[in-house]
Design a protein with these regions (language model features):
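Histidine- and acidic-residue-rich, metal-dependent catalytic cores
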Residues: 112-125, 138-141, 145, 173
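Membrane-interface starts of transmembrane alpha-helices
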Residues: 24, 62, 102, 106, ...
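Residue-level signal for inorganic ion chemistry
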Residues: 46, 117, 151
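Residues on a specific face of well-ordered alpha-helices
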Residues: 9, 107, 111-115, 119, ...
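Conserved small/polar residues in nucleotide/adenosyl-binding loops
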Residues: 171-178
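Divalent-cation-assisted or electrostatically stabilized phosphate/pyrophosphate-binding catalytic cores
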Residues: 87-112, 159-170
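Histidine/acidic-rich helix-loop-helix segments that form or flank divalent-metal centers
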Residues: 126-167
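Conserved N-terminal diphosphate/IPP-binding helix and adjacent helical/loop segment
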Residues: 1-65, 72, 78, 84-87, ...
């Protein structure tokens, strides 16, 4: 199976969990809107290519890792498009999540996609140490001091240390590329 098919299947499976009984239907729809139709899927493609080059021994884990990276990327786009940041009315040629579903649901959608990224990785059977390492890499790419959250927070500062902000962007890319 080719990389694009693997990525799309992993994302469809992950986002499909939002259709579980009890999940608010508007949240599920907003999550689908954020993830599909697809963008370039650069991050998961790189993930799959690196795993293949390193002798991939757990395709399910590779697919989950790629999906997790894409879910985090989509979450960052949902949050970044909101009026409190970039106020972007469109994303990928259609209304951004906040324009289509409102600000409160957009905020929850971004948060739900972050949680879903971790859940997607956690569901794959693998060695505990390997899973812990992957979860740490993913959490570093999202959190503090250099992840997506830190990068977004730098945009809220009245004075920006450009060198530190640049380092933050590099760490975010490095963590995602591990």
């Amino acid at each position: 199976m080719d990389a694009v098919t693997r990525i799309e299947q992993a994302l469809t499976s992950a986002v499909g969990r939002a259709d579980a009984p009890g999940c608010p239907p508007k949240l599920a729809a907003a999550m689908r809107h954020a993830v599909f139709p697809r963008g370039a899927r650069v991050r998961p493609r790189i993930c799959l290519a690196v795993a293949h080059a390193c002798g991939e021994d757990n395709a399910a884990l590779t697919d989950a890792a790629g999906a997790s990276l894409e879910l985090l990327h989509c979450a960052s786009l949902v949050h970044d498009d909101m009026p409190c940041f970039d106020d972007a009315a469109t994303r990928r040629g259609r209304p951004s999540v906040y324009k289509a579903f409102g600000e409160p649901l957009a905020l929850l959608t971004g948060d739900a996609l972050i949680v879903l990224a971790f859940q997607t990785l956690s569901r794959v059977p693998c060695d505990g140490q390997r899973l812990a390492s992957l979860l740490m890499i993913v959490s570093r790419s999202v959190g503090l001091p250099h992840g997506i959250v830190a990068g977004q927070a730098w945009e809220c500062e009245s004075e920006i240390d450009v060198e530190h902000y640049h380092r933050c962007l590099l760490y975010t890319s490095d963590a995602a590329d591990e």
